[in-house]
Amino acid sequence: MKIIGVTGGVGSGKTELLHYIEKNYRCRILLADEASHKVMQKGGRIYEPLVALLGSSVLDSSGEINRKEMAARIFSHEELLGRVNALIHPAVREFILEAVAEEREKAAVGADDAVDYFFLEAALLIECGYRSVVDEMWYIYCDLAVRRERLKKSRGYSDEKIDSILSSQLTEAQFRSGSDVVIDNSGNLEDAYRQIREALASGERK
């Protein structure tokens, strides 16, 4: 089983490409955002510490943590943001490592539901030190003008919001230097799909 990290800037089209991979390969796909949901939900490993830190005002009517309310609570509060991240990031990493170990065990014993690939997607894979977790890091590149157009059309983002998000992410050069494979998703999807097929076929030959 091969573990592949998938990263890239906002609006690069990672989700669409992962849908293609999921349909065409024996794989498991884990989104870091989904992992953060799991560890924060009621009964999750950091639910109680987060509520203790932020207070019950961040809970919704069912007792779950309202992520929008939490974001508003820590917005422009650097110290509190740091304390929240100090809880979330290690818990997410632990969740991911457990998922990887689970799939490795299935592959080792030849389980019926064993997979050939484990794809881990997150915008912060490189910054958060996941190079040591994955066998290969993929950077989904997309021309900035195309990304802006996608974000405006699909999410209704303003230029100001897009600029704010971009300023907090790695530069293209940093993404490229931290990755083994670059998939150019600036053009049509069929071309990106072809690059994916070639990258996986090349990996199998190594």
What residues fall within each predicted segment?
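Short beta-strand-centered segment that lines the nucleotide-binding/catalytic pocket of NTP-utilizing
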Residues: 27-40
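Walker A/P-loop
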Residues: 15
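NTP-dependent small-molecule kinase module
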Residues: 98-117, 131-140, 144-157, 167, ...
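Hydrophobic anchor at the beta1->P-loop junction of P-loop NTPases
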Residues: 6
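P-loop (Walker A) phosphate-binding loop of NTP-binding proteins
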Residues: 9
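ATP-dependent small-molecule kinase phosphotransfer cores
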Residues: 37-114
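ATP-binding Walker
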Residues: 12
